[in-house]
Amino acid sequence: MPAWGALFLLWATAEATKDCPSPCTCRALETMGLWVDCRGHGLTALPALPARTRHLLLANNSLQSVPPGAFDHLPQLQTLDVTQNPWHCDCSLTYLRLWLEDRTPEALLQVRCASPSLAAHGPLGRLTGYQLGSCGWQLQASWVRPGVLWDVALVAVAALGLALLAGLLCATTEALD
């Protein structure tokens, strides 16, 4: 390979991995995208990940939760290894559970919970709603907005109006008979 080819390859690799989060190591893939290896660095939070991340290794850290939407900006993400972390398996882990369930359901049995006591040592994929705790507040938060509440109020008023109209019609037809 000519010297300019080697220099170009070196430049392309450096350019592709320049957004690599510390303390992780990154490797450019031949088919575009990045291999991001953050294993064993004692991370307690997710680092800022490059949008081109295709394979993400987060095993053997100190992660306990994943914020909702943490992987939404990673459209190429195919592989996610989050094993060997002290996961706190409650409602805050719902996003991670659903993400894995949609993409790599077999990984759910490899991810083990460290806490709370109801879920400790069990695989994330086998937890029941009782073990996860009450997640109802998270589900409500997505639809409780001022516009939605007005819509619900209008539907309730319309239903009440229809019920009154039906009652009035029944009373009128009985009076005519």
UniProtKB/Swiss-Prot annotation:
GO CC entries: glycoprotein Ib-IX-V complex; plasma membrane
Sections of the chain in a coiled coil: none
LRR repeats: from-to residues: 60-83
Cytoplasmic face residues: 169-177
Membrane-topology annotation of the record: Single-pass type I membrane protein
Any one GO biological process: positive regulation of platelet activation
Miscellaneous notes: Platelet activation apparently involves disruption of the macromolecular complex of GP-Ib with the platelet glycoprotein IX (GP-IX) and dissociation of GP-Ib from the actin-binding protein.
Subunit structure: Two GP-Ib beta are disulfide-linked to one GP-Ib alpha. GP-IX is complexed with the GP-Ib heterodimer via a non covalent linkage.
Official protein name in the record: Platelet glycoprotein IX
Organism: Homo sapiens
Annotated gene: GP9
